[in-house]
Amino acid sequence: MRQTAKRCGRWLAVLLVLGILIGCRWVFPRRDRIAGEAGTVTTAQSVTEAQGRNQCGGCSAAYLLRADGKDITGAEAYAEIPLKLPNGYLLPQGIRSYLRQEGYPAVMCRGTPDQLCARLREGLPVIALIQEGEALHYVAVVGCDSESLYLADSLCPPAEGYNRVVSREEFARLQQIGLPGFEEVYITAAPDR
């Protein structure tokens, strides 16, 4: 009887550890293994828009969707994104879930600016989480070259295509957001065709 209880206890411990590991895989971004590539890359582009309060994630997701031909505003996307904190901030997992609901196999990754630029070759903008002053901020990265990244930033004046250019070094600094496990986070989404 004791051996059976010990055996059941071991199996429960194994199942608990597996559950924790699977949960961590859902919560934390995976390290991107793509090789960074030199060269100029631009993706499908759209019109940037000014955000409402805490709507940068919605604006970035809407930019990506508009670049792929969908008609949506940042406010509409923000309203649909799950996993909002009580203050209105969006978790990266919420944006990933929303893009999956829209038919995109979105993946949350951690990687360098070079790796992010390699992901742009898939054809759609990449949503990056960066430090903007004292707050965290989502932007759509729409292109890059050997020196700079081109952003569609909802805090900058609206424009066609991109409205902010940052050096690779500056972008790498902006990616250091101060949350262990979430440094250098971005969300990729290639259309599910």
PLM regions and their residue ranges:
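Cysteine-nucleophile protease catalytic domains, especially the papain-like/related folds used
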Residues: 28-108, 192
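Hydrophobic alpha-helical membrane-insertion segments, chiefly the h-region
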Residues: 18-26
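Noncatalytic regulatory segments and standalone regulatory/sensor domains
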Residues: 11, 25-28, 85, 100, ...
